[in-house]
């Protein structure tokens, strides 16, 4: 249902901050011959944590402490969802996209959780750590929460403990709603969520302010949600390397959706090193279909000659990842996301003067011009490609002239929809954007330009490289 999707999807936006975080960082130095147009991203000290405790916090935790009262949620949405996580108690029968927590006043509420963002179905199975790629943010959902307000009032009234437990979530969702509209399904409007919440929070004690302190541009810039299993290699968060310092602190800002003040932020922050430790333990899923091993071996040679200086090496024991930021003229991909944090500095100025930037484990937001060349572990599972999800298959990524300007897929994420030849999603080429399920790569922010490095390869080398990428 639209309401269910929107509630869970807002957490998808909020917790995308986790998509590039990790508990420890590699101390790999850039190798000699680092490509021109790149900058090495230095590591930062990180806190350790208990991975198992982190997983329990992930599937039961109250980092979002306000939501729909449990009886209302069950009445409207039911409680017979598949048992994807094996949870017990109140969470049994609730979608993996939500947690059931006890609000500060004792009311049980259903809240969105990290897995709204960082879990997705692939071939019929929920893969924890795979970025969501099916969500639809193309309609303005602020009115949905106005309707939810009426439902909670009808059940309990505005003077009830249930309304008190629900209202902080409703208030935040309605503030965010106008800023998270996208023009195509499947992409994520994460660039605006934290900026909007920050505009409604005092920097020092983080309490809510009804009126915005600074203006936030209305237009959302699309992103593709990265996979969690890449995190263990990263030195910086976000596609443009914006997030520096303590990743647990940076990631704990997801609590800004509903937290009361900095005291609650501190409680959440104390638990996030455990969650980071669990995220760091994840491994990429293996390609589940046959691989031509001889062809893949030839592709490894192509990869290490043409790709490894930016994306790393994957042949143990020589595995390494260089942590490079590639400047815009070099990579050539759509520049809008990178430019966004430079064209309106109010958000990172707020953050760098806020509670989150204080103490021994502070975070910082340092805008860069360019994009991080990501690790490629499990790349077969992470279609569509580029930072904005504009390219449906790896074959299209490696041969830019064949990238479709308009393309459409089913969003079923079943085996029947997976293209084992081109490695990615089966799609139809369209002549225009007739509906939200059609990706329009002609729009600013959505363009499929750049990363043309595969164009110079022969057809035989591209085929071999494609086979090798299945093995990562």
Please state what every model-predicted region is.
Residues 1-10:
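Bacterial N-terminal signal peptides that target proteins for export
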Residues 22-472:
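Periplasmic c-type cytochrome electron-transfer domains
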């Amino acid at each position: 249902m639209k309401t269910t999707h929107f509630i869970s999807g807002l957490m998808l936006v909020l917790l995308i901050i986790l998509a590039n975080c990790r508990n420890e960082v590699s101390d790999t130095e850039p190798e000699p011959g680092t490509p021109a147009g790149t900058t090495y991203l230095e590591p930062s000290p990180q806190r350790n944590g208990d991975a198992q405790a982190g997983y329990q916090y992930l599937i039961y935790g109250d980092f979002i402490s306000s939501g729909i009262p449990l009886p209302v949620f069950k009445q409207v949405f039911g409680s017979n969802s598949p048992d994807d996580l094996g949870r017990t108690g109140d969470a049994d029968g609730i979608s993996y996209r939500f947690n059931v927590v006890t609000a500060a006043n004792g009311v049980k509420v259903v809240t969105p959780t990290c897995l709204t963002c960082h879990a997705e179905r692939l071939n019929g199975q929920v893969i924890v750590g795979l970025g969501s790629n099916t969500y639809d943010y193309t309609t303005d959902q602020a009115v949905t929460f106005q309707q939810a307000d009426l439902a909670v009032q009808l059940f309990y009234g505005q003077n009830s403990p249930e309304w008190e437990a629900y209202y902080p979530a409703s208030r935040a969702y309605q503030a965010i709603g106008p800023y998270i509209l996208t023009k195509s399904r499947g992409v994520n409007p994460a660039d605006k969520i934290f900026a909007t919440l920050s505009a409604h929070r005092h920097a020092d004690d983080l309490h809510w302010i009804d009126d915005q302190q600074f203006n936030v541009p209305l237009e959302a810039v699309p992103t593709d949600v990265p996979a969690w299993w890449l995190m263990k290699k990263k030195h910086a968060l976000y596609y443009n390397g914006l997030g520096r310092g303590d990743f647990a602190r940076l990631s704990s800002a997801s609590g800004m959706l509903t937290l009361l003040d900095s005291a609650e932020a501190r409680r959440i922050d104390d638990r996030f090193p455990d969650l980071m430790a669990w995220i760091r333990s994840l491994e990429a899923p293996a390609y589940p279909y046959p691989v031509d091993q001889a062809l893949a071996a030839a592709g490894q040679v192509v990869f290490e000659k043409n790709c490894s200086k930016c994306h790393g090496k994957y042949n143990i024991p020589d595995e390494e990842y260089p942590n490079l930021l590639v400047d815009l003229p070099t990579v050539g991909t759509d520049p809008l996301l990178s430019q966004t944090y430079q064209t309106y500095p109010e958000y990172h100025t707020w953050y760098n003067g806020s509670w989150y930037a204080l103490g021994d484990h502070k975070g910082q937001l340092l805008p860069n011009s360019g994009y991080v060349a990501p690790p490629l572990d499990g790349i077969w599972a992470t279609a569509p490609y580029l930072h904005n999800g504009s390219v449906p298959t790896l074959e299209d990524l490696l041969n830019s002239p064949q990238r479709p300007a308009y393309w459409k897929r089913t969003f079923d994420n079943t085996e029947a929809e997976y293209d084992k030849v081109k490695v990615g999603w089966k799609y139809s080429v369209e002549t225009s954007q007739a509906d939200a399920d059609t990706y329009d790569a002609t729009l600013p922010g959505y363009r499929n330009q750049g990363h043309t490095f595969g164009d110079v390869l022969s057809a035989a080398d591209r085929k071999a490289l494609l086979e090798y990428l299945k093995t990562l």
